[in-house]
């Protein structure tokens, strides 16, 4: 925060809630709300004097139903907004990120004020059509998966796993990157990549090229 204050970098501060594909809807149980209230009040008091702080959010990808972000009608979100207004009062508050009205990027018109996704390459021309046709006002999270560089992989993978592979065929790769396997994508784009230790560097470069 100090460095952001000094360098003019605006901060989007989320409270410590995230769906992560487990519990998309934030808890409204009284016991949880009491704990959340205490931590949220401490967080606002600690951060509110930083000039870099621009906006608060209830959390990451909180959804009432699939593809529909939580709104202020949720008791959890309503409580956090009240805390922000009472203890800060100068900053904007968004129920969650993305704030919708749709959660994920889409070519459908008029429903993409603030969206997330996608995180994988959608192919040519589909990927570029989707991004080009979306009329979102703010694409607040998106990305592309890729393998780590060869030097990094050698720091945590056992020798027997230091070769190109689909995630499903090696438990060590799977443990570290279950969602983000790119082997088949990269073979489709660049041609067959043999699963030999000598090709590890080639594989990571191809993977990162697609990410870029």
Predicted segments with their positions:
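Short, low-complexity, polar/charged sequence segments that are solvent-exposed and flexible
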Residues: 8, 74-76, 112-115, 156-164
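Surface-exposed beta-strand edges and their flanking turn/coil or helix-capping segments
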Residues: 22-26, 108-109, 151-154
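Substrate-binding cleft/loops of secretory-pathway carbohydrate-active enzymes
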Residues: 68-75, 98-137, 145-151
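Substrate-binding clefts and catalytic carboxylate motifs of secreted carbohydrate-active enzymes
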Residues: 56, 84-85, 120-212
């Amino acid at each position: 925060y100090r460095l952001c204050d000094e360098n003019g970098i605006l901060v989007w501060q989320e409270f410590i809630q995230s769906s992560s594909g487990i519990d998309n809807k934030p808890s409204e149980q009284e016991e949880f709300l009491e704990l959340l209230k205490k931590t949220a009040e401490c967080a606002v008091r600690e951060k509110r004097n930083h000039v870099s702080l621009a906006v608060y959010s209830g959390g990451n990808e909180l959804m009432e139903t699939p593809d529909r972000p939580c709104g202020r009608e949720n008791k959890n979100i309503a409580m956090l907004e009240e805390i922000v207004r009472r203890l800060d009062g100068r900053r904007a508050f968004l129920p969650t990120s993305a704030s919708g009205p749709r959660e994920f990027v889409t070519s459908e018109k008029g429903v993409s004020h603030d969206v997330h996704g996608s995180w994988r390459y959608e192919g040519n021309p589909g990927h570029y059509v989707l991004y080009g046709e979306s009329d979102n006002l703010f694409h607040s999270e998106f990305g592309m998966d890729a393998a780590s560089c060869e030097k990094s992989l050698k720091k945590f993978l056992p020798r027997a796993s230091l070769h190109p592979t689909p995630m499903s065929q090696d438990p060590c790769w799977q443990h570290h990157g279950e969602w983000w396997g790119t082997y088949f994508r990269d073979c489709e784009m660049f041609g067959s990549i043999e699963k030999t230790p000598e090709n590890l560097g080639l594989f990571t470069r191809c993977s990162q090229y697609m990410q870029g």
